[in-house]
Swiss-Prot record:
Transmembrane segments: none annotated. The lineage of its organism: Eukaryota, Metazoa, Chordata, Craniata, Vertebrata. This is Ovomucoid. The keyword Translocase does not apply. It comes from Ortalis vetula (Plain chachalaca). Disulfide bonds join C8-C38, C16-C35, C24-C56. Avian ovomucoid consists of three homologous, tandem Kazal family inhibitory domains.
Length: 56
């Protein structure tokens, strides 16, 4: 059973689509989608991780 991961290698992006596929981060914040989550991961210098898919 591998830990759940999100590939953020193609981020950050200047703009994210308004796609609703919520992701819960380790900061207990719900991100709208992978793009906004990955941008936050980059901003956090990699300290932010995925808690689970779906709202927190």
């Amino acid at each position: 059973f591998a830990p759940v991961n999100v590939d953020c290698s193609d981020h950050p992006k200047p703009a994210c689509l308004q796609e609703q596929k919520p992701i819960c981060g380790s900061d207990n914040k719900t991100y709208d989608n992978k793009c906004s989550f990955c941008n936050a991961v980059v901003d956090s210098n990699g300290t932010l991780t995925l808690s689970h898919f779906g709202k927190c």
